[in-house]
UniProtKB/Swiss-Prot annotation:
This is Acetate kinase. Gene3D superfamilies: 3.30.420.40. GO terms for cellular component: cytoplasm. Belongs to the acetokinase family.
Length: 417
C-alpha cells in the first residue's frame, strides 16, 4: 500500500510517500518512496522534493519555485511531481497508485483519542477542537479539505492525532487545580503534544531491546524548536510537560514554557499589554530567542556561547538545560524510576553539547553519559550513549512521526475504522 502522509502548517506542507503492508510493518521494513517540503505557501512557493528506493538511495531531487497560493495548490504540486517521470518513482503514475492519505492533526480533544478514518463527523469534531489549537488545527483541516478535493471519495483518508498518545494520563496528572466546573464547562485540562514522536520512541526502544510494550518504562525528551518531556510507564504516557496547549513546560525556541501566570496580569496592568500582545510574547518572543536576544537556533547559540563567550547565549542554554533536568527528576520520582532517558527531535538527536549539559550532575540517580559515544551519536545515528551497565540508560533515537502516521493509516484502512 502506498500511503501519502501530509503535515500541513500555516505556510508549509510537508509530505512523505511510504510503501507499507502488514509483513513490512511486522518486520520493520516499510520504506519511504518520496519526501519533501513546500515552504512559503500563500506566495511564490519553494519546493524541495526527493525520491528514494527501498535501500534509501536517492533517485531524483527537485528544488525550484512555483506559485503556491493555497494548500490546495501545494498538494497539487506534490501530486504532479510524484506522478511524473521526472520523479524517478516506479509504480506511481496516477492518483490511483496512491492508496490512502494520512494526516497529522495536532489536537483531537477528549473525543478523538485514536487514529480514525475521516468522514464528515470526524471533520466536525476536528473543527470543534480549533479553539484548543487555533494555530494548528485550521491548517491541518486545510490539508484534509484539499486532499478530499484532489483524491475524491474513493481514496480513504485517516487522521492521526498528536494528542491521542496522552489519553492514558490519569486525572491527577491532566487536571489543573482550578475550580472543577471550569473543566466540566470548557474541558480545560492537560492534553499533551508530540505524541507521535514519543510513541515512535517507545516503539523503537522496545524493538531494539526485544521487549513487550507493557514493560517499557522510559522518559522521552523531544527537543526541537518545540520541546516536551513524556513519562512513559508500563508502556503508557502517564505525564507530559505540554499542557492544554503546546506552550506549557520546557523552554523552547520562541515559547516560554512554564511561567507564573500572575506575570501576565502584572504586564497587562504595568505596560498595557492586550491579550493578543501577551499571546505573542509567550509564543513568539520568549524561550531561547527571548533570553539570548539573538536567535532561537540552538546551533547558533552553542556557537555564540563557545566561540564568542556570549553571556546571554550561555544563560539561554543554562536555563534550557536546567528546566529539562527538573522535569527528568520529577518524572523519575513519579515513575518510581525509569529504565532509560531517550533524546529525540532536532536538538535531542544532534546537539551532543546540550545532552551533556542536561545529564551533568545527575549521577546521583545513575544518569551518566559516555563522552565519546555522545559525540559520535549525531546526524541521524541511533544508539546508547551511557556507559555499559548504567541505569537508567541514556539513548538517542531519531524520531519518525511520518512512519507512525503511515502505519496507523494502513491499520485504519484495513480494519475500516
Amino acid at each position: 500500500m502506498n500511503i501519502l502522509v501530509l503535515n500541513c502548517g500555516s505556510s508549509s506542507v510537508k509530505f512523505r510517500l511510504i510503501h507499507t503492508y502488514f509483513d513490512l510493518i511486522r518486520e520493520n521494513k516499510d520504506y519511504s518512496i518520496a519526501s519533501g517540503l513546500i515552504e512559503r505557501v500563500g506566495s511564490e512557493g519553494l519546493l524541495s522534493f526527493r525520491s528514494t528506493n527501498a535501500q534509501g538511495e536517492v533517485l531524483s531531487t527537485l528544488r525550484t519555485t512555483a506559485p503556491v497560493r493555497t494548500h490546495q495548490a501545494a498538494i497539487d504540486q506534490i501530486i504532479k511531481w510524484i506522478t511524473s517521470e521526472n520523479s524517478g518513482i516506479q509504480g506511481i503514475q496516477s492518483l490511483e497508485d496512491i492508496h490512502a492519505v494520512g494526516h497529522r492533526v495536532v489536537h483531537g480533544g477528549e473525543k478523538l483519542t485514536r487514529s480514525v478514518l475521516i468522514d464528515d463527523s470526524v471533520v466536525e469534531q476536528i473543527e470543534d477542537c480549533i479553539e484548543l489549537a487555533p494555530l494548528h488545527n485550521p491548517q491541518n483541516l486545510k490539508g484534509i479539505y484539499a486532499a478530499k478535493k484532489t483524491f475524491g471519495p474513493n481514496i480513504p483518508q485517516v487522521a492521526v492525532f498528536d494528542t491521542a498518545f496522552h489519553h492514558t494520563l490519569p486525572d491527577h496528572a491532566y487536571l489543573y487545580a482550578l475550580p472543577y466546573q471550569i473543566y466540566r464547562r470548557h474541558r480545560i485540562r492537560r492534553y499533551g503534544f508530540h505524541g507521535l514522536s514519543h510513541r515512535y520512541v517507545r516503539f523503537r526502544y522496545r524493538t531494539i531491546l526485544g521487549m513487550e510494550r507493557e514493560n517499557v518504562n522510559i522518559i522521552s525528551l523531544h527537543l526541537g524548536n518545540g520541546c516536551s518531556a513524556c513519562a512513559i510507564k508500563n508502556g503508557n504516557s502517564i505525564d507530559t510537560s505540554m499542557g492544554m496547549t503546546p506552550l506549557e513546560g520546557l523552554v523552547m525556541g520562541t515559547r516560554a514554557g512554564d511561567v507564573d501566570p500572575a506575570i501576565l496580569t502584572y504586564l497587562a496592568h504595568k505596560e498595557g499589554h492586550s491579550l493578543d500582545d501577551l499571546d505573542k510574547l509567550l509564543n513568539s518572543q520568549s524561550g531561547l530567542l527571548g533570553i539570548s536576544g539573538l536567535t532561537n537556533d540552538m546551533r547558533e547559540l552553542i556557537e555564540e556561547s563557545l566561540e564568542n563567550d556570549d553571556r546571554r547565549a550561555k544563560l539561554a542554554l543554562e536555563i534550557f538545560a536546567y528546566r529539562i533536568k527538573k522535569y527528568v527528576g520529577a518524572y523519575l520520582s513519579a515513575m518510581n524510576g525509569a529504565d532509560a532517558i531517550i533524546f529525540t527531535g532536532g536538538i535531542g538527536e544532534n546537539a551532543d553539547f546540550i545532552r551533556q549539559k542536561i545529564c551533568a550532575g545527575m549521577n546521583w540517580c545513575g544518569i551518566e553519559i559516555d563522552e565519546n559515544l555522545n559525540k559520535q551519536t549525531t546526524r541521524g545515528r541511533e544508539g546508547r550513549i551511557s556507559p555499559d551497565g548504567n541505569k537508567p540508560e541514556v539513548w538517542v533515537i531519531p524520531t519518525n512521526e511520518e512512519l507512525v502516521i503511515a502505519r496507523d493509516t494502513y491499520r485504519c484502512v484495513m480494519r475500516k475504522e
